[in-house]
Design a protein with these regions (language model features):
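Bacterial Sec-dependent N-terminal signal peptides
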Residues: 1-21
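Structured interaction patches on ligand/partner-binding surfaces of diverse proteins
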Residues: 3, 21, 70-76, 96-132
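Residues at beta-strand starts and edge strands
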Residues: 9-13, 50, 78, 87, ...
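Structural motif
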Residues: 17-47, 139-148
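Residues that cap or initiate secondary-structure elements
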Residues: 21-23, 60, 88, 99, ...
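Acidic Ser/Thr/Pro-rich low-complexity disordered segments
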Residues: 28-46, 60-66, 98-106
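Tryptophan-paired
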Residues: 40-92, 150-171
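Compositionally biased low-complexity segments at domain edges in trafficked proteins
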Residues: 122-157
Length: 171
């Protein structure tokens, strides 16, 4: 949670946080929405920002000023309002520690923004978390399936050391 230390030079961060997952073109689409894009069938834990981790870092000192689950950082009015010392900050929110994950079945949502805090002033920040990974969809034609009835596998390689092999039964 908040690390304190704002003291007499305190200002506040008032954060509005959202996750954009409608309109994401993905293969596990549950429905078609306006403009022909699709809406994914993401798990609630991945799209509900209350489950996200929020980190506020002082960009001048690189010290964390606050860290916690969004639901734990909200006040009685359901808003994230943090007292911070005057200075420059970065706020980051994400649904899980997916930054260095090379292959995952789970979507990774992340948002980042910088802002400044002035003494005695409330700084409003709108932070939007977006899909920060790539989803791969593999579709096989009927002619491929006919030609390779017995067995086959498909290898997906990200050229960064992560390889995933899908056999006939997992496609």
């Amino acid at each position: 949670l908040g690390k304190g230390g704002a003291g007499e030079n305190a200002g506040t961060l008032e954060l509005d946080l959202a996750s954009i997952y409608n309109g994401v073109t993905i293969s596990r689409a549950g429905e078609t929405v306006d403009g022909g894009t699709t809406t994914g069938s993401f798990n609630e834990e991945d799209v509900n920002v209350d489950n996200y981790t929020l980190v506020v870092t002082n960009t001048e000192t690189q010290e964390e000023a606050a860290r916690g689950k969004v639901s734990e950082l909200k006040n009685e009015n359901g808003k994230v309002v943090l007292s911070l010392g005057e200075g420059s900050y970065a706020v980051t929110a994400y649904n899980y520690e997916g930054e260095n994950v090379t292959v995952s079945e789970r979507p990774y949502f992340k948002g980042e923004q910088t802002f400044s805090v002035k003494k005695g002033i409330a700084t409003n920040v709108d932070l939007t978390c977006k899909l920060a990974c790539v989803e791969v969809s593999i579709g096989l034609t009927s002619s491929f399936e006919e030609a390779f009835k017995d067995d086959y596998s498909v290898i997906v390689d990200n050229r960064d050391g992560a390889t995933r092999i899908f056999d006939k039964s997992s496609l």
